[in-house]
From Swiss-Prot:
A biological process term (GO) from this entry: division septum assembly
InterPro entries from the UniProt entry: G_ENGB_dom, GTP-bd, GTP-bd_ribosome_bio_YsxC, P-loop_NTPase
Entry's Gene Ontology molecular function annotations: GTP binding; metal ion binding
Gene transcribed to yield this protein: engB
A Pfam entry, by short name: MMR_HSR1
The organism of origin for this protein: Azotobacter vinelandii (strain DJ / ATCC BAA-1303)
Cofactor(s) listed in the protein's UniProt record: Mg(2+)
Domain EngB-type G: 30-204
Alphabetical keyword list: Cell cycle, Cell division, GTP-binding, Magnesium, Metal-binding, Nucleotide-binding, Septation
Residues given in the record as GTP binding sites: 38-45, 64-68, 82-85, 149-152, 182-185
Organism placement in taxonomy: Bacteria, Pseudomonadati, Pseudomonadota, Gammaproteobacteria, Pseudomonadales
Protein name: Probable GTP-binding protein EngB
Family: Belongs to the TRAFAC class TrmE-Era-EngA-EngB-Septin-like GTPase superfamily. EngB GTPase family.
Length: 216
């Protein structure tokens, strides 16, 4: 793991760019961007806020802006993207289908997408949505890093066992190319490890003289 991650400074200056309801409303498809995906209430907004040291993403349990693709600028060539939360129980089925359509359009067409961070609640990992995302990443060759969020909700031993179980299942079903780690926003657990992955995907891993550790 790097001693001083070059992505940290960029994350600390992250700023909201725009929200897009459709792919044609997204920023110009150049540079590099990393997308954050996960079921509603998997802790995606809290993770983004923790990684950027800012209150970028709304943490309300109501859908709100989660129906949009929200872009955050790191610098002129790098962005983070908060993808629509999936599976919110109170959202009408037609709206869910609308979200899914535009999520698939974004994932299938975005050339600047360098990797996807998939967030899973450690107490309920590998849902149908998670498996769908893993299938897509495996088929497309897209780098994917999994954050097992809310790790503080389990005892240390139970969290480690959950990590090993999920890692084994992912490597068995989708290959060795996907990395998995524990993450807790309130405890700031796993922040440096996640920053190392972002640094590599955003072309910053060599800036401090060392290769980032993906935590696989």
């Amino acid at each position: 793991m790097s001693f001083k991650n070059p992505v940290l400074g960029l994350c600390q200056q992250a700023a909201f760019m725009l929200s897009a309801a459709r792919v044609d409303q997204c920023p110009a498809d150049d540079g590099l961007e990393v997308a954050f995906a996960g079921r509603s209430n998997a802790g995606k907004s809290s993770a983004l806020n923790t990684l950027t040291h800012a209150n970028l993403a709304r943490t309300s349990k109501t859908p709100g802006r989660t129906q949009l693709l929200n872009f955050f600028r790191l610098d002129d060539r790098r962005r983070l993207v908060d993808l629509p939360g999936y599976g919110y129980a109170k959202v009408p089925i037609p709206l869910k289908q609308h979200w899914q359509h535009h999520l698939e359009a974004y994932l299938g067409s975005r050339r600047s997408l360098a990797g996807v961070v998939l967030l899973m609640d450690i107490r309920h990992p590998l849902t149908d949505f998670d498996r769908m995302m893993l299938d897509w990443a495996g088929a497309s060759g897209m780098p994917m890093h999994i954050l097992l969020t809310k790790a503080d909700k389990l005892a240390f031993g139970a969290a480690k066992n959950a990590l090993l179980k999920v890692r084994r299942e992912i490597h068995k079903g989708w290959g060795e190319g996907m990395s998995v780690q524990l993450f807790s926003a309130p405890k700031r657990q796993g922040v440096e490890e996640a920053h190392d992955v972002l640094a590599r995907w955003l072309g910053l891993a060599g800036d401090d003289g060392g290769e980032a550790d993906a935590g696989a």
